[in-house]
C-alpha cells in the first residue's frame, strides 16, 4: 500500500501537533522568585496570571503554621521564624506567598517541597479572618507534597 504525499504530510502534521500540544489539564507554573520584576514591581508573567484568574501551580515550602486549625499557610523558599505580614505590607518579603485554602491545613515539615495550586492575586490586601496584610496571595488553593 502506497501513501500519497498529501496523506503523509497530513498525518505527520497531526502527529507533531499531538507531540507538542500541551495537555488540557496542565497548569501554568511560576516560581516564587519570578513573581517580581523588581523588589517593588510585579513581573509581567505574574500580572498576566492574576488578570486571567486561571489556576496556576507554585512550588515551594510550607512555613511553620502561625496558628492551629487554620485554613491558610505561608508558601516560601526558606523557613521563616516570624510572621512576615502581621503588621504592614512594607515588611512583605519578596519570597513568600499567602495561601488561602477551603479547609483546615495539615502542617507539612518545613523541609518537604510542596506544589501549591490556586488563583493568583496581587496587590495589598488585608485578610478579613486573620487581619494579615499581604501583597501576593493564592486563593481557592490546594497543595500536595512532592
Give the role of each language-model region.
Residues 1-3, 7-26:
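N-terminal export signals
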Residues 25-146:
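OB-fold and OB-like single-stranded nucleic-acid-recognition modules
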Amino acid at each position: 500500500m502506497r501513501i500519497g504525499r498529501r496523506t503523509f504530510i497530513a498525518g505527520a502534521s497531526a502527529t507533531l501537533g499531538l507531540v507538542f500540544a500541551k495537555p488540557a489539564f496542565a497548569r501554568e507554573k511560576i516560581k516564587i522568585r519570578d513573581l517580581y520584576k523588581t523588589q517593588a514591581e510585579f513581573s509581567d508573567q505574574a500580572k498576566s496570571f492574576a488578570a486571567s484568574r486561571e489556576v496556576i501551580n507554585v512550588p515551594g515550602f510550607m512555613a511553620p503554621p502561625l496558628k492551629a486549625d487554620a485554613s491558610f499557610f505561608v508558601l516560601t523558599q526558606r523557613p521563616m521564624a516570624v510572621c512576615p505580614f502581621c503588621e504592614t505590607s512594607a515588611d512583605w518579603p519578596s519570597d513568600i506567598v499567602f495561601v488561602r485554602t477551603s479547609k483546615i491545613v495539615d502542617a507539612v515539615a518545613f523541609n518537604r517541597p510542596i506544589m501549591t495550586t490556586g488563583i493568583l492575586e496581587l496587590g495589598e490586601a488585608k485578610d478579613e479572618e486573620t487581619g494579615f496584610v499581604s501583597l501576593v496571595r493564592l486563593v481557592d488553593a490546594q497543595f500536595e507534597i512532592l
